[in-house]
């Protein structure tokens, strides 16, 4: 199943709507039963919470949206039940927030989970659009622009990170 975000980004609204309807049809029984729907890809997860309800305008899409959360939100919400590692490392972590995470103020839960549960010393990399999300960074016509955008702030910050630092970014896009 697909949330339809990739089609929507390309202006293919009818195809996006069809994919969103298929996904909502599959997820609605779970949402109705109180099951939390956890997404690992910020663009898709947040499409379920924002674009899909607007695109479909149905109670089912709204129910799925209300049940959907990011992995970091799930972990942060269930924090009291999670054991804190006895030997939590104070390893430095450079966190790159996905544009959709930034737009919905959802970098904070990822930062909190890394800091409070994993014991990491987290620094959020301050960036504008990295130019690499979705299909943009892969496109023949947009690849060079994508690289220039990444070089504006993200890639220099990654290169400047200490050797022992972990670089963390949610999702696959």
Language model region names:
Residues 1-173:
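Iron-sulfur cluster-binding electron-transfer modules in prokaryotic oxidoreductases
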